[in-house]
Amino acid sequence: MIIRLVTYHAIDGKDVERWMQTSASELRSVKGMRHLEFVRSKINPSQFGAIMHFRTIEDLDNYKSKESGTYQKLVRSVRETWMDNTKPVNEQVFEILDI
């Protein structure tokens, strides 16, 4: 199982949770995605993110390439409307180990 964690900072005064609610079903229906959770930092409430679960790294790669229309549309929506572009966006990809 592969987990992708993406975090970013919201623009002050923007209702990012509303964007998450309106985009959740579209994101969850993307081929290859097993599970999706949205998160907000308890330490810095302007920091939001998404935790995406994929079965394999190939599913994640397909999400970014073959599903690029949906993926790019959602990324563009976040960047243009909700995200503070002066602060960093972080992406981390993890593999769950069978230990």
Predicted regions span which residues?
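Short amphipathic alpha-helix segments
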Residues: 21-29
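Short, surface-exposed ligand-recognition loops at beta-strand->loop->(often short) alpha-helix junctions
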Residues: 8-19
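Hydrophobic/aromatic beta-strand elements that line small-molecule binding cavities or substrate pockets
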Residues: 24-25, 36-38, 51-52
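Short coil/turn motifs at secondary-structure junctions
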Residues: 11-13, 43, 55-59
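An amphipathic, aromatic/His-enriched active-site/gating alpha helix that lines ligand/cofactor pockets
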Residues: 28-34, 53-90
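Glycine-rich beta-strand-turn "strand-cap" elements at beta-sheet edges
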Residues: 2, 9, 37-49, 74-99
